[in-house]
Amino acid sequence: KKCIQSEDKKWFTPREFEIEGDRRASKNWKLSIRCGGYTLKFLMENKLLPEPPSTRKKRILKSHNNTLVDPCAVHKKKNPDASVNLSEFLKKCSEMWKTIFAKEKGKFEDMAKADKAHYEREMKTYIPSKGEKKKKFKDPNAPKRPPLAFFLFCSEYRPKIKGEHPGLSIDDVVKKLAEMWNNTAAADKQFYEKKAAKLKEKYKKDIAADRAKGKPNSAKKRVVKAEKSKKKKEEEEDEVDE
């Protein structure tokens, strides 16, 4: 009975390897696995091992979407460099679905049922990805990024527009401000652009000063903590001696 050796030099029976493969699939599926001289590719092609379960959730094709799957594949084979517009593809599927006869529809409905059954089988081994992006820590005391010239213009004229048109939605207010900004003369825009440039320079200086201060590293913190605990222990011992 042949055993399978993984890249980390562990040996498994075929069944154990199948279970272990399912467990590792979502993290890292190694291709350099040996089984009595056979490559993993050979084992997969001959269906001696199951393919690792997908970590990405798949969708089921609806019946009418199957109507153009084969023609689309043929077109792709003949024109490998040509791109397929997804929205146009789906429109054609829907149009063809309305025009074909009931007997022909049955063929595609069967394809959809088979696809659904395949989807349900795959979902039994589906392992969702556990990779979560850690949120970057934002220092609340860090210098705030300065606004652009347009936003300085908006902050000045927004209250005026809201006063004149109290029923306007936020989107409409923004559109009106954008129109006003576009119609403003270049000479008048310079006032806000110069103000924005000054704020940007101040921001750069504040950032440089903030970085120059630096933060005490963790090693230094540990040393200080150790010294404090040592001092506290010595004080307690002195109290006991007294």
Swiss-Prot record:
Residues 51-127, 143-211 bind DNA. A motif (Nuclear localization signal) lies at residues 91-108. Keywords: Coiled coil, Cytoplasm, DNA-binding, Nucleus, Phosphoprotein, Repeat, Transcription, Transcription regulation, Ubl conjugation. GO terms for biological process: negative regulation of endothelial cell migration; negative regulation of protein export from nucleus; regulation of angiogenesis; regulation of extrinsic apoptotic signaling pathway via death domain receptors; regulation of Fas signaling pathway; regulation of transcription by RNA polymerase II; telomere maintenance. Transmembrane segments: none annotated. The keyword Nucleus applies. One of its GO terms (molecular function) is DNA binding. It comes from the Eukaryota. Residues 1-50 form the SAND domain. PROSITE patterns: HMG_BOX_2, SAND. Coiled coil: none annotated. It is found in: Nucleus; Nucleus, PML body; Nucleus, Nuclear body; Cytoplasm. Residues 218-231 have a biased composition (Basic residues). Residues 205-242 are annotated as: Disordered. SUPFAM superfamilies: HMG-box (SSF47095), SAND domain-like (SSF63763). The keyword Phosphoprotein applies. GO terms for cellular component: cytoplasm; PML body. Homodimer. Interacts with members of the HP1 family of nonhistone chromosomal protein, such as CBX5 and CBX3 via the PxVxL motif. Interacts with ETS1; the interaction is direct and modulates ETS1 transcriptional activity. Interacts with the MRN complex which is composed of two heterodimers RAD50/MRE11 associated with a single NBN; recruits the complex to PML-related bodies. Interacts with HIPK2; positively regulates TP53-dependent transcription. Interacts with CASP8AP2; may negatively regulate CASP8AP2 export from the nucleus to the cytoplasm. Together with PML, this tumor suppressor is a major constituent of the PML bodies, a subnuclear organelle involved in a large number of physiological processes including cell growth, differentiation and apoptosis. Functions as a transcriptional coactivator of ETS1 and ETS2. Under certain conditions, it may also act as a corepressor of ETS1 preventing its binding to DNA. Through the regulation of ETS1 it may play a role in angiogenesis, controlling endothelial cell motility and invasion. Through interaction with the MRN complex it may be involved in the regulation of telomeres lengthening. This is Nuclear autoantigen Sp-100. It comes from Hylobates lar (Lar gibbon).
